[in-house]
Amino acid sequence: MNRERIKKFVGGQAVIEGVMMRGPGVTATAVREPAGTIVVQKEATKSIVDTYPILKKPFLRGCVALYESLVIGMKALSFSAKAAGDEEEEMSNSEIAITMVISTIFAIAVFLALPTFIVKFIPGVQDNHIVLNLIEGVIRLVLFLLYIWGIGLTKDIQRVFQYHGAEHKTIHTYELDLPLTVENVRQQSRLHARCGTNFLLIVMVVSIFVFAFLGWPNLLERIVSRVLLMPVVAGIAYEVIRLAGRSEHSFVKAIIKPGLVLQYMTTREPEDDQIEVAIRALEEVRPPESDAYEEE
């Protein structure tokens, strides 16, 4: 039975004045220094799923991928801040861990605790658990959109959003088997189905349905139950994103369409010098042509 050969995934992340790209077994962060030169940090990356193959199973792999992406992303941000001149030295592993803990606490407080706290003040729906969870999900989504809109008002984040667009355009060029030139990259869409923006939006939607089965206990129990179920929600969202990256089915396209629209907020059209940085990062991680494909 013939199996379809597909191009191996390359993912990425916009950082301060640069782009991080992650390919099979390697990660590279390219940053434009104040002097104008491009500096690159490249390192081999081994996933925990290589040691424990059971973690490659659907839904489990999503939790692993999310954790590893956060760790690698924080390291890339630390390097980019130093290279771009915003910081004198990179963060240590302990500083990265502390930053991740603080960021997690902030996310739990704003996107989990606050919405479920606000809902209790809405009259007329307190006896309908389904409606309560639906309203909570809508509030969570509104807070998320306000957060994205708010940070997008700052000049520094606007430049990050431009690099985000450059990252997507460059990955599109790679996936289309086109030469990685500024001209080719510039012509591609700045939206991408496997973007983290899509992932976060799908998390918001999936959480509404998952949390609906929890009933409506007291505030503390609601917060704890939602935190404990986030790996489940993330695992489901990851599988949806993974499917979206490989399927042309109209139903799948419909699911990810809202996330693509949302990317108009989280990406900007990049300048040519920003595209050059994204190209440099991808060139460092792209697998050789002999190993660029895998069987579906």
Report residues per predicted region.
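Select subsegments of transmembrane alpha-helices in polytopic membrane proteins
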Residues: 95-111, 192-203
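Multi-pass alpha-helical transmembrane bundle typical of ion/small-solute transporters
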Residues: 53, 66, 73-94, 120, ...
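Membrane interface segments of multi-pass transport proteins and intramembrane proteases
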Residues: 84-89, 118-135, 214-224, 243-253, ...
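Small-residue-enriched core segments of transmembrane alpha-helices in multipass membrane transport
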Residues: 133-144, 223-237
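Juxtamembrane "helix exit" motif at the C-terminal ends of alpha-helical transmembrane segments
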Residues: 75-83, 103-127, 203-225, 234, ...
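Divalent-cation
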Residues: 1-78
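Polar-ligand-bearing catalytic/cofactor-coordination segments
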Residues: 2-11, 15-21, 25, 35, ...
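A transmembrane-helix-recognition feature enriched in membrane-embedded lipid enzymes
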Residues: 58-81, 246-265
